[in-house]
Amino acid sequence: QRGKPVWNEDILAFVPGGSLPQGMSVAGAANGTFGLSSILKSAYATTSELLSCLGFSVKFSDLPKAEDEAQSGTAFWHVREGRKRAWVDLQNDVTVKDIKLSYQEGFRSVEHLKRYSTLGMATDQGKTSNIAGLAILAECSGKTIPETGTTIFRPPYTPVTIGALAGRAR
């Protein structure tokens, strides 16, 4: 739907941004909400809204008693002083060195990095590697992740077993 996630520096993650497609809602950690109490409130509000849109009257019991614990995170995108290769995209064998080299070669755009290094072009479409790759490119350029930009995000997916891809054995 071309909805572009936005970077949330507080949680070091992308969250849904702008308007979601009609009928789509996001709650809890997928929406950047952490802490048990906050997640329960988010789930309650989102479920209530969805059910009322479907014409159901909503009557929930009281939410369970819970508290949010303080949460914090630290960005750790790669080991800076490692002596060996530091892999970023395991499916395409892209390393931190490859990303830094692409920047040195003048590939400053995220899309150029993607094509130069094949970062995020494997079967997972970058779902396991792009954030670390974007962070390393941002570090090279002295910019933030939002200033660096993103590639086009693919819709959520359900993993498929290797057996389903292999077909029948004879």
Identify the function of each model-found stretch:
Residues 1-170:
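Residues forming the flavin
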